[in-house]
């Protein structure tokens, strides 16, 4: 097996409450554990998490197995509230174009023998790298914005050393159609989980004497379906609902709604660290993922890291009935699905599951066993094998 040096290029903010940075850090860590020499290049961005550790390995609860380098960057986010949106988008476009070119030049100067790994969110960098015939893995988590399609088409046409990766089958199909990439060349790999972090978590027991605790972990942005969950909580007052995640305005809105409606059975805990999350999973009786079915991204392209953490935690899961979820789990076998955006159906499924201890245990066991298939290490191993199909030396 050839051991590659890998440089991961990212434009994300670190540390961050966003799941994309958790995925990036875990991928870098898993590649390093596999034997690759890994460097992560990230921009300097203004940190929005109060009191967050500046030690990224501590923040993401990972051992130090790879190197992280901060690349100079002009963070325009502070201007967003003070200038018209059209002006901000134009400035941001120019800023991103200049920085991504600078990032590639920084890579060439310091790491030009490395295989590049990056998400699809760097269109200018991807286009420039393709012209230089540098080998690269491009991981797609959604379809590129229409304004950048030409950059991606040209990039994959220019370079035979670009390896496309998609997190769902439907995303791979759309990438193939729109970008003109052979479907068979696209590696389909969903997200993953650090199994070891949940090793001590036990399968849910059949004891239903205590007050039931339903837990949601994740972002509070509209397409995550937290509004549906809150609606269910208003009806099911005999059940505790714990919501973990969210910062700033998103969290403030939910807090205001909770207070206005006197929802004493809703506990808003805000953002919690990767180190603490397994403990909160352990305290839950049921975990919930109520994503909307009104957006293409959630219905076809989503492979949320939280789903795999839920699976590894050994707790029964209720989730929106989305094609992207069905790619991983089977209804009534390893998960209980409800009609997306339908609070009545969600309420019925909560009542059904909470009244059936045997079903709770069945779903928990099956999903936890299936989670072993989706470890970060297994994901990296599949990438390593796929690389061999391409002449990138």
Region roles according to the model:
Residues 170, 192:
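Carbohydrate-associated surface elements
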Residues 345, 352, 359-373, 385:
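A short, well-ordered alpha-helix in the C-terminal region of glycosyltransferases
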Residues 7-9, 165, 207-233, 241-242:
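Conserved donor-binding/catalytic core segment of Leloir-type glycosyltransferases
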Residues 331-343, 352-357:
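Conserved acidic donor-binding segment of nucleotide-sugar-dependent glycosyltransferases
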Residues 252-279:
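Nucleotide-activated donor-binding/catalytic signature segment of Leloir-type glycosyltransferases, i.e.
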Residues 44-46, 217, 240-254:
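Glycosyltransferase donor-sugar binding loop
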Residues 287-289, 309-312, 316-319:
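Short hydrophobic beta-strand element within catalytic cores of glycosyltransferases
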Residues 1-62, 110-111, 134, 163, ...:
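N-terminal subdomain of nucleotide-sugar transferases
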